[in-house]
UniProtKB/Swiss-Prot annotation:
This is Plasmepsin X. InterPro entries: Aspartic_peptidase_A1, Aspartic_peptidase_AS, Pepsin-like_dom, PEPTIDASE_A1, Peptidase_aspartic_dom_sf. Pfam families: Asp. Disulfide bonds join C39-C51, C42-C48, C279-C284, C447-C448, C482-C521. Autocleaved into a p16 prodomain form and two mature forms p44 and p51.
Length: 573
Protein backbone atom coordinates (compact mmCIF):
# COMPACT_ATOMS: atom_id res chain seq x y z
CA UNK A 1 0.00 0.00 0.00
CA UNK A 2 1.39 3.37 -1.06
CA UNK A 3 2.07 5.75 1.81
CA UNK A 4 1.05 9.41 1.62
CA UNK A 5 3.99 11.69 2.23
CA UNK A 6 3.85 14.22 5.11
CA UNK A 7 4.06 17.05 2.57
CA UNK A 8 0.97 15.78 0.73
CA UNK A 9 -0.88 15.37 4.02
CA UNK A 10 0.00 18.92 5.01
CA UNK A 11 -1.13 20.18 1.58
CA UNK A 12 -4.55 18.50 1.77
CA UNK A 13 -5.07 19.64 5.36
CA UNK A 14 -4.29 23.22 4.38
CA UNK A 15 -6.82 23.01 1.54
CA UNK A 16 -9.44 21.63 3.92
CA UNK A 17 -8.93 24.32 6.56
CA UNK A 18 -8.75 27.03 3.90
CA UNK A 19 -12.07 25.92 2.41
CA UNK A 20 -13.67 25.55 5.85
CA UNK A 21 -12.44 28.95 7.00
CA UNK A 22 -13.59 30.52 3.76
CA UNK A 23 -17.04 29.01 4.26
CA UNK A 24 -17.19 30.18 7.85
CA UNK A 25 -16.18 33.69 6.84
CA UNK A 26 -18.96 33.74 4.29
CA UNK A 27 -21.69 32.16 6.35
CA UNK A 28 -21.01 34.18 9.48
CA UNK A 29 -22.31 37.22 7.62
CA UNK A 30 -25.82 36.15 8.41
CA UNK A 31 -25.39 34.51 11.82
CA UNK A 32 -27.39 36.08 14.62
CA UNK A 33 -25.30 38.27 16.88
CA UNK A 34 -22.31 38.47 14.54
CA UNK A 35 -21.13 41.19 12.23
CA UNK A 36 -21.07 40.77 8.46
CA UNK A 37 -17.93 40.77 6.38
CA UNK A 38 -17.34 44.09 4.61
CA UNK A 39 -17.27 43.72 0.83
CA UNK A 40 -13.58 44.71 0.78
CA UNK A 41 -12.74 41.63 2.89
CA UNK A 42 -14.87 39.19 0.89
CA UNK A 43 -12.58 38.23 -1.99
CA UNK A 44 -15.24 36.32 -3.91
CA UNK A 45 -18.74 37.69 -3.37
CA UNK A 46 -20.23 34.84 -5.41
CA UNK A 47 -18.81 32.32 -2.92
CA UNK A 48 -20.03 34.41 -0.01
CA UNK A 49 -23.37 35.06 -1.75
CA UNK A 50 -22.95 38.69 -0.82
CA UNK A 51 -21.19 40.95 1.66
CA UNK A 52 -21.76 44.00 3.85
CA UNK A 53 -21.99 47.41 2.18
CA UNK A 54 -19.28 49.84 3.32
CA UNK A 55 -21.29 52.97 3.82
CA UNK A 56 -20.63 55.89 1.55
CA UNK A 57 -22.75 58.87 2.54
CA UNK A 58 -23.87 61.17 -0.25
CA UNK A 59 -25.58 64.56 -0.14
CA UNK A 60 -26.64 64.36 -3.80
CA UNK A 61 -30.33 63.72 -3.23
CA UNK A 62 -33.02 63.90 -5.94
CA UNK A 63 -36.55 64.13 -4.46
CA UNK A 64 -39.05 61.83 -6.18
CA UNK A 65 -42.81 62.10 -6.37
CA UNK A 66 -45.39 59.44 -7.15
CA UNK A 67 -47.04 59.88 -10.53
CA UNK A 68 -50.12 57.68 -10.84
CA UNK A 69 -53.28 57.85 -12.93
CA UNK A 70 -55.47 56.74 -10.02
CA UNK A 71 -53.64 56.29 -6.71
CA UNK A 72 -56.40 54.16 -5.20
CA UNK A 73 -57.19 51.91 -8.14
CA UNK A 74 -55.96 48.33 -7.86
CA UNK A 75 -58.96 46.90 -9.68
CA UNK A 76 -56.85 45.90 -12.67
CA UNK A 77 -54.75 43.68 -10.40
CA UNK A 78 -57.89 42.05 -9.01
CA UNK A 79 -59.11 41.34 -12.55
CA UNK A 80 -55.69 39.96 -13.38
CA UNK A 81 -56.05 37.48 -10.51
CA UNK A 82 -59.58 36.56 -11.58
CA UNK A 83 -58.38 35.69 -15.09
CA UNK A 84 -55.94 33.16 -13.61
CA UNK A 85 -58.46 31.08 -11.66
CA UNK A 86 -58.79 28.31 -14.25
CA UNK A 87 -55.04 28.02 -14.70
CA UNK A 88 -55.13 28.43 -18.49
CA UNK A 89 -53.78 32.01 -18.84
CA UNK A 90 -50.16 33.13 -19.03
CA UNK A 91 -49.09 36.78 -19.10
CA UNK A 92 -45.62 37.56 -20.37
CA UNK A 93 -43.26 40.35 -21.29
CA UNK A 94 -40.22 40.18 -23.55
CA UNK A 95 -36.79 41.55 -22.75
CA UNK A 96 -36.60 44.41 -25.24
CA UNK A 97 -35.85 48.11 -25.18
CA UNK A 98 -38.79 50.51 -25.44
CA UNK A 99 -40.05 53.93 -24.53
CA UNK A 100 -41.85 52.43 -21.54
CA UNK A 101 -38.85 50.59 -20.20
CA UNK A 102 -37.01 47.46 -21.18
CA UNK A 103 -39.35 44.86 -19.71
CA UNK A 104 -42.05 44.90 -22.33
CA UNK A 105 -42.90 44.21 -25.96
CA UNK A 106 -43.52 46.53 -28.88
CA UNK A 107 -47.12 45.35 -29.04
CA UNK A 108 -49.68 43.86 -26.73
CA UNK A 109 -51.59 45.14 -23.73
CA UNK A 110 -51.18 47.41 -20.75
CA UNK A 111 -52.36 46.87 -17.20
CA UNK A 112 -55.28 49.16 -17.98
CA UNK A 113 -56.54 46.69 -20.59
CA UNK A 114 -57.67 44.04 -18.09
CA UNK A 115 -61.36 44.42 -18.99
CA UNK A 116 -60.62 43.84 -22.67
CA UNK A 117 -58.24 41.00 -21.86
CA UNK A 118 -60.84 39.24 -19.70
CA UNK A 119 -63.48 39.69 -22.38
CA UNK A 120 -61.21 38.19 -25.03
CA UNK A 121 -60.16 35.29 -22.78
CA UNK A 122 -63.76 34.45 -21.86
CA UNK A 123 -64.76 34.57 -25.53
CA UNK A 124 -62.00 32.15 -26.45
CA UNK A 125 -62.84 29.93 -23.48
CA UNK A 126 -66.46 29.77 -24.63
CA UNK A 127 -65.42 28.82 -28.14
CA UNK A 128 -63.08 26.15 -26.77
CA UNK A 129 -65.88 24.76 -24.59
CA UNK A 130 -68.25 24.66 -27.57
CA UNK A 131 -65.64 22.80 -29.58
CA UNK A 132 -65.18 20.41 -26.68
CA UNK A 133 -68.95 19.86 -26.45
CA UNK A 134 -69.15 19.18 -30.17
CA UNK A 135 -66.34 16.70 -29.81
CA UNK A 136 -68.12 14.93 -26.94
CA UNK A 137 -71.36 14.78 -28.95
CA UNK A 138 -69.45 13.23 -31.80
CA UNK A 139 -67.83 10.54 -29.65
CA UNK A 140 -71.15 9.78 -27.93
CA UNK A 141 -72.84 9.19 -31.27
CA UNK A 142 -70.01 7.08 -32.61
CA UNK A 143 -70.28 4.46 -29.88
CA UNK A 144 -67.99 2.00 -31.57
CA UNK A 145 -65.12 4.51 -31.62
CA UNK A 146 -65.67 6.23 -28.29
CA UNK A 147 -63.24 4.06 -26.35
CA UNK A 148 -60.59 4.23 -29.06
CA UNK A 149 -60.72 8.02 -29.16
CA UNK A 150 -60.62 8.21 -25.37
CA UNK A 151 -57.46 6.10 -25.38
CA UNK A 152 -55.80 8.52 -27.79
CA UNK A 153 -56.67 11.70 -25.86
CA UNK A 154 -53.42 11.82 -23.93
CA UNK A 155 -51.28 11.33 -27.01
CA UNK A 156 -52.80 13.56 -29.69
CA UNK A 157 -52.95 17.34 -29.82
CA UNK A 158 -56.41 18.65 -29.06
CA UNK A 159 -56.73 20.66 -32.25
CA UNK A 160 -56.93 17.43 -34.28
CA UNK A 161 -59.99 16.39 -32.33
CA UNK A 162 -61.56 19.79 -32.70
CA UNK A 163 -61.27 19.41 -36.46
CA UNK A 164 -62.73 15.90 -36.25
CA UNK A 165 -65.52 17.13 -34.02
CA UNK A 166 -66.61 19.65 -36.63
CA UNK A 167 -66.61 16.93 -39.26
CA UNK A 168 -68.51 14.64 -36.90
CA UNK A 169 -71.23 17.23 -36.32
CA UNK A 170 -71.87 17.52 -40.03
CA UNK A 171 -72.08 13.75 -40.35
CA UNK A 172 -74.34 13.55 -37.33
CA UNK A 173 -76.76 16.07 -38.83
CA UNK A 174 -76.79 14.31 -42.15
CA UNK A 175 -77.46 11.02 -40.45
CA UNK A 176 -80.43 12.45 -38.56
CA UNK A 177 -81.90 13.66 -41.84
CA UNK A 178 -81.41 10.23 -43.36
CA UNK A 179 -82.84 7.99 -40.67
CA UNK A 180 -83.69 5.23 -43.17
CA UNK A 181 -80.01 4.74 -43.90
CA UNK A 182 -78.86 5.34 -40.33
CA UNK A 183 -77.20 2.01 -39.69
CA UNK A 184 -75.37 1.88 -43.01
CA UNK A 185 -74.30 5.50 -42.70
CA UNK A 186 -73.14 4.91 -39.15
CA UNK A 187 -70.95 2.02 -40.16
CA UNK A 188 -69.50 3.94 -43.10
CA UNK A 189 -68.81 6.98 -40.93
CA UNK A 190 -67.15 4.82 -38.30
CA UNK A 191 -64.93 3.21 -40.90
CA UNK A 192 -64.05 6.53 -42.53
CA UNK A 193 -63.44 8.25 -39.23
CA UNK A 194 -61.28 5.39 -38.04
CA UNK A 195 -59.05 5.63 -41.09
CA UNK A 196 -58.97 9.43 -41.01
CA UNK A 197 -58.24 9.47 -37.32
CA UNK A 198 -55.41 6.99 -37.64
CA UNK A 199 -53.93 8.95 -40.55
CA UNK A 200 -54.21 12.28 -38.75
CA UNK A 201 -52.87 10.69 -35.60
CA UNK A 202 -49.77 9.43 -37.39
CA UNK A 203 -49.26 12.75 -39.17
CA UNK A 204 -49.73 14.70 -35.95
CA UNK A 205 -47.32 12.53 -34.03
CA UNK A 206 -44.71 12.98 -36.78
CA UNK A 207 -45.13 16.76 -36.78
CA UNK A 208 -45.17 16.99 -32.98
CA UNK A 209 -42.54 14.47 -31.96
CA UNK A 210 -41.03 17.13 -29.73
CA UNK A 211 -43.96 18.04 -27.52
CA UNK A 212 -42.20 20.99 -25.89
CA UNK A 213 -43.55 22.76 -22.84
CA UNK A 214 -45.79 25.80 -23.18
CA UNK A 215 -43.06 27.98 -21.68
CA UNK A 216 -40.92 27.25 -24.74
CA UNK A 217 -43.83 27.71 -27.10
CA UNK A 218 -44.78 31.21 -26.07
CA UNK A 219 -41.21 32.51 -26.06
CA UNK A 220 -41.10 31.92 -29.81
CA UNK A 221 -44.38 33.70 -30.54
CA UNK A 222 -44.23 36.79 -32.72
CA UNK A 223 -46.87 39.26 -31.61
CA UNK A 224 -48.52 41.36 -34.27
CA UNK A 225 -50.73 43.59 -32.14
CA UNK A 226 -52.52 40.51 -30.83
CA UNK A 227 -54.44 40.87 -27.61
CA UNK A 228 -54.56 37.19 -26.67
CA UNK A 229 -52.82 34.26 -28.34
CA UNK A 230 -54.33 30.77 -28.08
CA UNK A 231 -52.16 27.65 -28.25
CA UNK A 232 -53.11 24.20 -29.45
CA UNK A 233 -53.47 23.18 -25.81
CA UNK A 234 -55.99 26.01 -25.21
CA UNK A 235 -53.56 28.03 -23.12
CA UNK A 236 -54.21 31.76 -23.51
CA UNK A 237 -51.04 33.86 -23.81
CA UNK A 238 -51.33 37.57 -23.02
CA UNK A 239 -48.44 39.81 -24.14
CA UNK A 240 -47.91 42.96 -22.07
CA UNK A 241 -46.23 46.06 -23.47
CA UNK A 242 -44.87 46.93 -20.05
CA UNK A 243 -45.63 46.53 -16.36
CA UNK A 244 -46.07 50.19 -15.51
CA UNK A 245 -48.81 51.29 -13.17
CA UNK A 246 -47.15 53.89 -10.96
CA UNK A 247 -44.00 55.87 -11.59
CA UNK A 248 -41.66 57.84 -9.39
CA UNK A 249 -40.44 60.93 -11.20
CA UNK A 250 -37.82 63.52 -10.30
CA UNK A 251 -36.50 66.83 -11.60
CA UNK A 252 -34.10 66.82 -14.55
CA UNK A 253 -32.76 69.95 -16.28
CA UNK A 254 -32.20 69.76 -20.05
CA UNK A 255 -30.55 72.30 -22.36
CA UNK A 256 -29.04 75.79 -22.10
CA UNK A 257 -30.72 77.67 -20.53
CA UNK A 258 -32.10 74.70 -18.57
CA UNK A 259 -35.65 73.45 -19.10
CA UNK A 260 -37.28 71.35 -16.38
CA UNK A 261 -38.82 67.94 -17.06
CA UNK A 262 -39.86 65.20 -14.65
CA UNK A 263 -38.77 61.82 -16.07
CA UNK A 264 -39.08 58.32 -14.65
CA UNK A 265 -35.82 56.98 -13.17
CA UNK A 266 -35.89 53.38 -14.32
CA UNK A 267 -33.48 50.59 -13.37
CA UNK A 268 -35.19 48.37 -15.97
CA UNK A 269 -33.96 50.30 -19.03
CA UNK A 270 -30.92 52.22 -20.25
CA UNK A 271 -31.92 54.86 -22.80
CA UNK A 272 -32.95 58.48 -22.19
CA UNK A 273 -36.15 59.83 -23.80
CA UNK A 274 -37.79 63.26 -23.50
CA UNK A 275 -41.15 64.51 -24.82
CA UNK A 276 -40.70 67.60 -27.01
CA UNK A 277 -42.82 70.55 -28.15
CA UNK A 278 -42.85 69.06 -31.65
CA UNK A 279 -45.41 66.56 -30.38
CA UNK A 280 -48.70 68.40 -30.94
CA UNK A 281 -51.15 65.62 -30.04
CA UNK A 282 -53.47 66.48 -27.17
CA UNK A 283 -52.01 63.71 -25.02
CA UNK A 284 -48.53 65.23 -25.46
CA UNK A 285 -49.81 68.65 -24.45
CA UNK A 286 -50.89 67.24 -21.09
CA UNK A 287 -47.27 66.86 -20.00
CA UNK A 288 -44.31 69.22 -19.66
CA UNK A 289 -42.35 69.30 -22.94
CA UNK A 290 -38.77 70.13 -23.85
CA UNK A 291 -38.16 72.62 -26.69
CA UNK A 292 -34.83 71.92 -28.46
CA UNK A 293 -35.07 75.22 -30.37
CA UNK A 294 -34.63 77.13 -27.11
CA UNK A 295 -31.42 75.31 -26.18
CA UNK A 296 -28.05 76.70 -27.31
CA UNK A 297 -26.35 73.37 -26.64
CA UNK A 298 -28.77 71.09 -28.50
CA UNK A 299 -27.37 69.27 -31.52
CA UNK A 300 -29.41 67.00 -33.74
CA UNK A 301 -27.72 63.69 -34.49
CA UNK A 302 -25.88 63.42 -37.83
CA UNK A 303 -26.54 59.69 -37.84
CA UNK A 304 -29.68 58.66 -39.70
CA UNK A 305 -31.28 57.07 -36.66
CA UNK A 306 -34.84 57.96 -35.77
CA UNK A 307 -37.04 57.03 -32.87
CA UNK A 308 -40.07 54.97 -33.86
CA UNK A 309 -41.76 52.59 -31.45
CA UNK A 310 -44.97 50.73 -32.26
CA UNK A 311 -47.47 49.91 -29.53
CA UNK A 312 -50.64 47.85 -29.64
CA UNK A 313 -52.81 50.95 -29.85
CA UNK A 314 -50.52 53.29 -31.76
CA UNK A 315 -46.97 54.53 -32.02
CA UNK A 316 -44.58 57.31 -31.07
CA UNK A 317 -41.94 58.77 -33.35
CA UNK A 318 -39.10 61.22 -33.16
CA UNK A 319 -35.39 61.75 -33.64
CA UNK A 320 -32.10 61.50 -31.78
CA UNK A 321 -29.95 64.37 -30.55
CA UNK A 322 -27.50 65.51 -27.88
CA UNK A 323 -27.73 68.19 -25.21
CA UNK A 324 -26.54 69.15 -21.75
CA UNK A 325 -28.32 67.62 -18.75
CA UNK A 326 -28.17 68.43 -15.07
CA UNK A 327 -29.27 65.94 -12.41
CA UNK A 328 -29.04 67.55 -9.00
CA UNK A 329 -25.57 69.10 -8.89
CA UNK A 330 -24.15 66.89 -11.64
CA UNK A 331 -23.64 68.33 -15.12
CA UNK A 332 -23.67 65.87 -18.05
CA UNK A 333 -22.64 67.33 -21.42
CA UNK A 334 -23.19 65.85 -24.88
CA UNK A 335 -25.67 63.24 -23.73
CA UNK A 336 -27.43 61.38 -26.55
CA UNK A 337 -31.17 60.98 -26.06
CA UNK A 338 -34.39 60.36 -27.94
CA UNK A 339 -36.80 63.21 -28.72
CA UNK A 340 -40.47 62.20 -28.84
CA UNK A 341 -42.03 64.34 -31.61
CA UNK A 342 -45.32 62.66 -32.50
CA UNK A 343 -47.82 60.14 -31.23
CA UNK A 344 -50.60 58.32 -33.04
CA UNK A 345 -53.48 56.19 -31.80
CA UNK A 346 -54.48 53.45 -34.20
CA UNK A 347 -57.22 52.09 -31.98
CA UNK A 348 -60.48 52.35 -33.94
CA UNK A 349 -62.45 52.18 -30.71
CA UNK A 350 -60.61 55.13 -29.22
CA UNK A 351 -58.71 54.64 -25.98
CA UNK A 352 -55.77 56.26 -24.26
CA UNK A 353 -52.48 57.11 -25.89
CA UNK A 354 -49.28 56.23 -24.08
CA UNK A 355 -49.05 59.64 -22.38
CA UNK A 356 -52.61 59.28 -21.12
CA UNK A 357 -51.95 56.13 -19.17
CA UNK A 358 -48.31 56.79 -18.25
CA UNK A 359 -48.29 60.60 -18.12
CA UNK A 360 -44.51 60.76 -18.25
CA UNK A 361 -42.27 63.54 -19.54
CA UNK A 362 -39.24 61.37 -20.13
CA UNK A 363 -37.30 58.33 -18.98
CA UNK A 364 -33.78 58.14 -17.58
CA UNK A 365 -32.63 54.53 -17.86
CA UNK A 366 -30.26 53.42 -15.10
CA UNK A 367 -29.61 49.94 -16.49
CA UNK A 368 -26.39 48.65 -18.00
CA UNK A 369 -24.70 49.67 -21.30
CA UNK A 370 -25.60 46.34 -22.90
CA UNK A 371 -29.20 47.50 -23.37
CA UNK A 372 -28.33 50.89 -24.88
CA UNK A 373 -29.85 51.61 -28.30
CA UNK A 374 -29.45 55.42 -28.54
CA UNK A 375 -25.92 56.83 -28.46
CA UNK A 376 -22.59 55.38 -27.36
CA UNK A 377 -22.71 55.88 -23.60
CA UNK A 378 -25.60 55.62 -21.12
CA UNK A 379 -26.59 58.57 -18.98
CA UNK A 380 -25.19 57.25 -15.68
CA UNK A 381 -21.90 56.19 -17.30
CA UNK A 382 -21.57 59.65 -18.84
CA UNK A 383 -22.31 61.24 -15.47
CA UNK A 384 -19.54 59.18 -13.83
CA UNK A 385 -17.08 59.98 -16.63
CA UNK A 386 -17.64 63.74 -16.36
CA UNK A 387 -17.89 63.78 -12.55
CA UNK A 388 -14.97 61.58 -11.39
CA UNK A 389 -15.55 62.37 -7.71
CA UNK A 390 -18.92 60.59 -7.80
CA UNK A 391 -18.84 56.96 -6.67
CA UNK A 392 -20.41 54.53 -9.20
CA UNK A 393 -23.53 53.84 -7.18
CA UNK A 394 -27.04 55.13 -6.56
CA UNK A 395 -29.84 54.20 -4.21
CA UNK A 396 -33.62 54.47 -3.92
CA UNK A 397 -35.82 55.17 -0.94
CA UNK A 398 -39.54 54.78 -1.72
CA UNK A 399 -41.66 56.27 1.05
CA UNK A 400 -44.57 54.11 2.32
CA UNK A 401 -46.65 57.29 2.56
CA UNK A 402 -45.89 58.84 -0.85
CA UNK A 403 -43.83 61.42 1.01
CA UNK A 404 -40.05 61.78 0.86
CA UNK A 405 -39.20 59.27 -1.84
CA UNK A 406 -35.63 59.86 -2.96
CA UNK A 407 -32.96 58.97 -5.52
CA UNK A 408 -29.45 59.34 -4.10
CA UNK A 409 -26.53 59.68 -6.53
CA UNK A 410 -23.07 58.47 -5.47
CA UNK A 411 -23.97 56.69 -2.24
CA UNK A 412 -26.58 56.31 0.47
CA UNK A 413 -28.17 58.23 3.32
CA UNK A 414 -28.43 56.62 6.78
CA UNK A 415 -31.65 58.48 7.44
CA UNK A 416 -33.54 56.15 5.07
CA UNK A 417 -32.72 52.67 6.42
CA UNK A 418 -31.97 50.70 9.55
CA UNK A 419 -29.56 47.84 10.23
CA UNK A 420 -27.02 46.67 7.66
CA UNK A 421 -27.09 46.79 3.88
CA UNK A 422 -26.40 43.35 2.41
CA UNK A 423 -24.93 43.30 -1.08
CA UNK A 424 -25.77 40.61 -3.66
CA UNK A 425 -23.73 40.08 -6.87
CA UNK A 426 -25.37 40.75 -10.24
CA UNK A 427 -25.41 37.69 -12.50
CA UNK A 428 -25.33 39.41 -15.87
CA UNK A 429 -24.95 43.12 -16.53
CA UNK A 430 -28.09 43.85 -18.49
CA UNK A 431 -30.74 44.04 -15.78
CA UNK A 432 -30.05 44.43 -12.08
CA UNK A 433 -30.64 40.73 -11.49
CA UNK A 434 -29.32 38.41 -8.78
CA UNK A 435 -29.53 34.68 -8.16
CA UNK A 436 -32.53 33.47 -6.15
CA UNK A 437 -31.90 30.24 -4.21
CA UNK A 438 -35.26 29.59 -2.56
CA UNK A 439 -38.69 31.12 -2.11
CA UNK A 440 -41.05 30.22 0.72
CA UNK A 441 -44.70 31.03 1.33
CA UNK A 442 -44.85 30.35 5.04
CA UNK A 443 -43.31 26.87 5.32
CA UNK A 444 -44.13 25.93 1.72
CA UNK A 445 -41.11 26.01 -0.61
CA UNK A 446 -42.22 26.96 -4.14
CA UNK A 447 -38.82 27.70 -5.74
CA UNK A 448 -36.11 27.01 -6.95
CA UNK A 449 -35.39 23.54 -8.35
CA UNK A 450 -34.30 25.24 -11.56
CA UNK A 451 -31.99 28.25 -11.73
CA UNK A 452 -33.98 31.37 -10.91
CA UNK A 453 -33.26 35.01 -10.32
CA UNK A 454 -34.71 38.29 -9.07
CA UNK A 455 -34.80 41.55 -11.05
CA UNK A 456 -34.91 44.78 -9.02
CA UNK A 457 -36.96 47.15 -11.17
CA UNK A 458 -37.97 50.66 -10.09
CA UNK A 459 -40.18 50.91 -13.19
CA UNK A 460 -42.46 48.05 -12.10
CA UNK A 461 -45.10 48.60 -9.42
CA UNK A 462 -46.06 45.10 -8.30
CA UNK A 463 -43.96 42.05 -7.54
CA UNK A 464 -44.30 39.16 -9.98
CA UNK A 465 -44.34 35.37 -10.10
CA UNK A 466 -43.82 33.17 -13.18
CA UNK A 467 -46.78 31.07 -14.30
CA UNK A 468 -45.20 27.87 -12.97
CA UNK A 469 -45.55 29.18 -9.40
CA UNK A 470 -48.54 31.54 -9.55
CA UNK A 471 -51.27 28.93 -9.08
CA UNK A 472 -49.59 27.61 -5.95
CA UNK A 473 -49.03 31.17 -4.78
CA UNK A 474 -52.72 32.13 -5.13
CA UNK A 475 -53.78 28.94 -3.37
CA UNK A 476 -51.59 29.85 -0.41
CA UNK A 477 -52.25 33.60 -0.46
CA UNK A 478 -55.76 34.38 -1.63
CA UNK A 479 -57.85 37.54 -1.79
CA UNK A 480 -60.39 38.03 0.95
CA UNK A 481 -63.05 40.50 2.06
CA UNK A 482 -61.75 43.12 4.48
CA UNK A 483 -62.19 46.75 5.51
CA UNK A 484 -60.05 49.58 6.82
CA UNK A 485 -61.26 48.63 10.29
CA UNK A 486 -60.49 44.91 10.31
CA UNK A 487 -57.80 44.25 7.69
CA UNK A 488 -54.95 44.19 10.24
CA UNK A 489 -56.67 41.42 12.19
CA UNK A 490 -57.45 39.46 9.02
CA UNK A 491 -53.85 39.63 7.79
CA UNK A 492 -52.53 38.07 11.00
CA UNK A 493 -53.41 34.65 9.60
CA UNK A 494 -51.45 35.20 6.36
CA UNK A 495 -47.95 33.72 5.89
CA UNK A 496 -44.61 35.50 5.56
CA UNK A 497 -42.99 35.42 2.10
CA UNK A 498 -39.27 34.62 2.28
CA UNK A 499 -36.77 35.26 -0.52
CA UNK A 500 -33.56 33.31 0.14
CA UNK A 501 -30.25 34.50 -1.31
CA UNK A 502 -27.59 32.14 0.05
CA UNK A 503 -27.97 32.56 3.79
CA UNK A 504 -29.58 35.99 3.50
CA UNK A 505 -33.34 35.82 3.98
CA UNK A 506 -35.53 38.77 3.01
CA UNK A 507 -38.97 38.60 4.58
CA UNK A 508 -42.12 40.29 3.32
CA UNK A 509 -44.89 40.42 5.92
CA UNK A 510 -48.61 40.34 5.04
CA UNK A 511 -49.12 44.05 5.68
CA UNK A 512 -46.26 44.70 3.22
CA UNK A 513 -47.35 42.51 0.32
CA UNK A 514 -51.15 42.80 0.66
CA UNK A 515 -53.14 45.80 -0.62
CA UNK A 516 -56.67 46.95 0.20
CA UNK A 517 -59.02 47.84 -2.65
CA UNK A 518 -62.82 48.20 -2.47
CA UNK A 519 -63.14 46.10 0.69
CA UNK A 520 -60.94 43.36 -0.74
CA UNK A 521 -57.46 42.47 0.50
CA UNK A 522 -55.31 40.98 -2.27
CA UNK A 523 -51.63 40.16 -2.79
CA UNK A 524 -49.71 42.81 -4.75
CA UNK A 525 -48.36 40.17 -7.11
CA UNK A 526 -48.88 39.57 -10.81
CA UNK A 527 -48.29 36.47 -12.90
CA UNK A 528 -45.63 37.45 -15.44
CA UNK A 529 -43.24 35.27 -17.42
CA UNK A 530 -39.97 36.88 -18.52
CA UNK A 531 -38.32 34.63 -21.13
CA UNK A 532 -34.65 34.18 -20.31
CA UNK A 533 -31.78 31.76 -20.62
CA UNK A 534 -31.83 31.61 -16.82
CA UNK A 535 -35.31 30.15 -16.48
CA UNK A 536 -37.62 31.82 -13.99
CA UNK A 537 -37.58 35.55 -13.22
CA UNK A 538 -39.15 37.16 -10.17
CA UNK A 539 -39.52 40.94 -10.30
CA UNK A 540 -39.42 43.07 -7.16
CA UNK A 541 -41.06 46.42 -7.83
CA UNK A 542 -41.27 49.91 -6.41
CA UNK A 543 -44.61 49.76 -4.56
CA UNK A 544 -44.64 46.16 -3.33
CA UNK A 545 -40.98 45.78 -2.37
CA UNK A 546 -39.00 49.03 -2.34
CA UNK A 547 -41.49 50.73 -0.05
CA UNK A 548 -40.24 48.27 2.55
CA UNK A 549 -36.58 47.94 1.58
CA UNK A 550 -33.96 50.58 0.88
CA UNK A 551 -32.21 49.48 -2.33
CA UNK A 552 -28.64 50.26 -3.43
CA UNK A 553 -27.22 49.75 -6.95
CA UNK A 554 -23.41 49.60 -7.26
CA UNK A 555 -21.58 49.37 -10.58
CA UNK A 556 -18.80 46.81 -10.80
CA UNK A 557 -15.08 47.11 -11.48
CA UNK A 558 -12.55 44.85 -13.20
CA UNK A 559 -12.08 42.92 -9.96
CA UNK A 560 -15.61 42.98 -8.55
CA UNK A 561 -19.06 42.47 -10.09
CA UNK A 562 -21.89 44.94 -9.95
CA UNK A 563 -24.08 44.46 -6.90
CA UNK A 564 -27.52 45.22 -5.49
CA UNK A 565 -27.85 46.07 -1.81
CA UNK A 566 -30.91 45.65 0.41
CA UNK A 567 -31.70 47.00 3.88
CA UNK A 568 -34.90 47.40 5.86
CA UNK A 569 -36.31 50.87 5.07
CA UNK A 570 -37.27 53.26 7.81
CA UNK A 571 -41.02 53.75 7.90
CA UNK A 572 -41.17 57.16 9.59
CA UNK A 573 -39.96 59.27 6.64
Amino acid sequence: MKRISPLNTLFYLSLFFSYTFKGLKCTRIYKIGTKALPCSECHDVFDCTGCLFEEKESSHVIPLKLNKKNPNDHKKLQKHHESLKLGDVKYYVNRGEGISGSLGTSSGNTLDDMDLINEEINKKRTNAQLDEKNFLDFTTYNKNKAQDISDHLSDIQKHVYEQDAQKGNKNFTNNENNSDNENNSDNENNSDNENNLDNENNLDNENNSDNSSIEKNFIALENKNATVEQTKENIFLVPLKHLRDSQFVGELLVGTPPQTVYPIFDTGSTNVWVVTTACEEESCKKVRRYDPNKSKTFRRSFIEKNLHIVFGSGSISGSVGTDTFMLGKHLVRNQTFGLVESESNNNKNGGDNIFDYISFEGIVGLGFPGMLSAGNIPFFDNLLKQNPNVDPQFSFYISPYDGKSTLIIGGISKSFYEGDIYMLPVLKESYWEVKLDELYIGKERICCDEESYVIFDTGTSYNTMPSSQMKTFLNLIHSTACTEQNYKDILKSYPIIKYVFGELIIELHPEEYMILNDDVCMPAYMQIDVPSERNHAYLLGSLSFMRNFFTVFVRGTESRPSMVGVARAKSKN
